[in-house]
Amino acid sequence: MSELRDLVIDAHGGIARWNKVKTVDGDMSITGGLWARKGWPDALKDVHVTAAAEKQWISYRPFIGEGMRTSCTPDHTIIETLDGKPVKDRRNPRAAFDGHTVETPWDDLHLAYFSGYAMWNYLNTPFIFALPGFQTEEIEPWDENGEKRRRLKVAFPDHIATHCPEQIFHVNDEGLICRVDYSAPVAGGAPTAHYLDDHKDFSGIKMATRRRALRRKADGTAIPDPVFVAIDIAEIRFS
């Protein structure tokens, strides 16, 4: 636990407000070089996402084609019709990435799993930091183009599907997360600097509406091109 963790949660709306949330719905466009490399260019360019706040579950629709959606938990990835009829599924989905490299193409269930766990994390952060099993620690600050930013190191519990067990969250002067450093082994494991901006208030909760994932150099600085993942969120609704 850390003072910075509490500051970040409060800046994004506070735990009392978040505890009233059951689901998060978002309309968004997800593009970038990663998807083409994996064989799915523009597959997530115009999607609606529904994520649970009380458990790790998420659904994309449409998925791949009209009339299809996903239903994903850490242990089970399902592609189904809009009325809930399973079309195909994979249990223990993370194991299906064993032996992959950056260039290994994905099938549709790989795509569903990666995009699912990643977006669930994005939509539930930073509030998940208050859950049992998460460990947080403030570490030395970072200078980003002359701006000094505080940093929060977060260790994730084993039962949460995420990019990697330990991630570094950069915090701006408003207490908002503006960058995350991680690597994602299921997507090749390249060191990543994931930038967040254009934070907006949606019913009392602040979320970044623009995200860009870039390659991170050994000195911690980001390589601006190419953009591996670009996420632009048009609307967020809580229920």
PLM regions: where:
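Flexible, processing/modification-adjacent segments and terminal tails
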Residues: 3, 83-160
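Gly/Pro-enriched, hydrophobic low-complexity segments
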Residues: 146-239
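Tryptophan-centered motif/residue detector
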Residues: 18, 35-37, 122, 182, ...
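Catalytic loop of the DD-peptidase/beta-lactamase superfamily, centered on the K-T-G motif
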Residues: 64-107, 216, 221-238
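Short, solvent-exposed secondary-structure boundary motifs
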Residues: 34-43, 57-64, 120-135, 156-162, ...
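Catalytic cores of transferase enzymes with a strong primary signal for eukaryotic protein kinases
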Residues: 2-5, 226
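Alpha-helix capping/hinge segments and adjacent helical runs
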Residues: 4, 8-18
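N-terminal mature ectodomain segment of secretory-pathway/periplasmic proteins
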Residues: 15-89, 138
